[in-house]
Structure formats: structure tokens, C-alpha cells
Swiss-Prot record:
This is 2-dehydro-3-deoxy-phosphogluconate aldolase. The lineage of its organism: Bacteria, Pseudomonadati, Pseudomonadota, Gammaproteobacteria, Enterobacterales. Pfam families: Aldolase. InterPro entries: Aldlse_KDPG_KHG, Aldolase_TIM, KDPG/KHG_AS_1, KDPG/KHG_AS_2. NCBIfam families: eda, PRK05718.1.
């Protein structure tokens, strides 16, 4: 972690809402990122669920300097190296493995690994990590479960993701242990497909306003 250019905490505190994005067409990447930034959302998680995801990260990193673009669904050291080379400023994984944790601590961008149990949390802590993704948040018991997991670990911070929506995101943000939340509602698939970037900007503005109210 000594080579990380920035900390996971710095990334997550730039939230408070991180859109979890699935890009199917490369031409959507830059206008979508600009639309989110215009709405006050700068930290973007592009999931590695499609073939063009890495190139989309590269384009956003090059063409939208106000965005803090990272990679989601990073599951192995090879992917971590690939997204780092593409210009990702952080990486998020759905879970954690020792090979991935080792690669992250030796790499140059912060990894925010997913955890759903205390044992997983403690493994990540053994590698020096202090910020984690609580995933899948709602399926794992939601706010009450996260409160229970976070209880013994006063210095650990979280970005809950999974089942988070406009209806419940403020409940998570109210927790002391939560720096930001991740959610897919900010970039609806139909808005992306139709090029309705004004709608994406409006959703971003709404989320930021609600988080800071």
C-alpha cells in the first residue's frame, strides 16, 4: 500500500454516492461520465462485466479529468493489473482472496474489497486495509447487519452496495462507519441505451442533494 497514489478513504469520501455502472457500448462511456460529473457525482465504478469495460475506463480517464474512475468486479491480480494500466484510480471487488489482497498491497491503486462476514473483514485488515465494500448489503441483512459487523471495529469504514436505492441509501449514510454507498439506480440501463444523459445528470443531482440534506 506504500505505493498507492491515493488512499481508499480519499476515494470513498469523494462520494457520497458511487454509481455502479455496466457499459455495453463504448460510445456511451464519456458522455455518461460527463453527465454524472455535471450532477455532482465524481467517483465512478465501471464494472468488468462487459467486453468494453476496460477500454471505457481508459477513455474516461483520458477525456473526463474531473471524474475519479475506477473498476468494479475485479476478481484476480491479472484484472487488477489490467485496469491499473488502463488508468483506473481504484478497484473494487465483490469479495476477497489472498492473491488479490497481496497484489493490491503491492500495487499502485487502492483496492476496496467486498466483505459480508467478520472473518472476511479481519482477513482484509491483516493486509492493512481499512476500507471495505459491504456486499451484497440488503441480502446480507442491510443496515442492522452492517451495524453489527462494524461494531467491534471502530476505525473501519464501508461502502455498502447491493440492493441500495433512492429509498434506503440515506439509512446507510446515517451510519458512522459508512463513507458512501454504491448503487446502480444512478445510471439506468434504458437511459444509457437511449442516450438520455440529462436524466442521468438529474438522478445524480437528486442523490447528492438527498445525501447532504
Amino acid at each position: 500500500m506504500k505505493n498507492w497514489k491515493t488512499s481508499a478513504e480519499q476515494i470513498l469520501t469523494a462520494g457520497p454516492v458511487v454509481p455502479v455502472i455496466v457499459i455495453n457500448k463504448l460510445e456511451h462511456a464519456v458522455p455518461m461520465a460527463k453527465a454524472l460529473v455535471a450532477g455532482g457525482v465524481r467517483v465512478l465504478e465501471l464494472t468488468l462485466r462487459t467486453e468494453c469495460a476496460v477500454e471505457a475506463i481508459r477513455l474516461i480517464a483520458q477525456e473526463v479529468p474531473d471524474a475519479i474512475v475506477g473498476a468494479g468486479t475485479v476478481t484476480n491480480p491479472q484484472q487488477l493489473a489490467e485496469v491499473t494500466a488502463a488508468g483506473a484510480q481504484f478497484a473494487i471487488s465483490p469479495g476477497l482472496t489472498e492473491p488479490l489482497l497481496k497484489a493490491a498491497t503491492e500495487g499502485t491503486i487502492p483496492l476496496i474489497p467486498g466483505i459480508s462476514t467478520v472473518s472476511e473483514l479481519m482477513l482484509g485488515m491483516d493486509y492493512g486495509l481499512r476500507e471495505f465494500k459491504f456486499f451484497p448489503a440488503e441480502a446480507n441483512g442491510g443496515v442492522k447487519a452492517l451495524q453489527a459487523i462494524a461494531g467491534p471495529f471502530g476505525k473501519i469504514r464501508f461502502c455498502p452496495t447491493g440492493g441500495i436505492s433512492l429509498k434506503n441509501y440515506r439509512d446507510y449514510l446515517a451510519l458512522k462507519s459508512v463513507l458512501c454507498v454504491g448503487g446502480s439506480w444512478l445510471v439506468p440501463a434504458d437511459a444509457l441505451e437511449s442516450g438520455d444523459y440529462d436524466r442521468i445528470t438529474a438522478l445524480a443531482r437528486e442523490a447528492v442533494a438527498g445525501a447532504t440534506a
